[in-house]
């Protein structure tokens, strides 16, 4: 299926939304493990190589999601910018929207399913620091 999508329905850039790399944050987002994105990335590159395509996979990530700390963003940067060598283009701070689990956690500071406290980056400075990890250069 992926090969059909890449070869016949992609115009050069395939945008996907893994949203984060850290399992704890992904669990709060109700997203699958990051290993699935890594597998998709490997398969995408393999398909492009075998078909002579110079296509790009464009991942979308979120900063300041409830449960996400600066340490999580540092780990994300290490995996995505370092190990996988992506240059990120799409960066979004969490924007709370009505009727979503993420918004409930943002406003209450807890996971409604477990009652567990969840860290929330609330100040502009906390959000700026988290987002800054997307654009840090390797030294």
Model regions: which residues?
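C-terminal accessory regions of radical SAM enzymes
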Residues: 71, 87-89, 93-139
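Conserved AdoMet/S-adenosylmethionine-binding subsite of the radical SAM
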Residues: 1-93
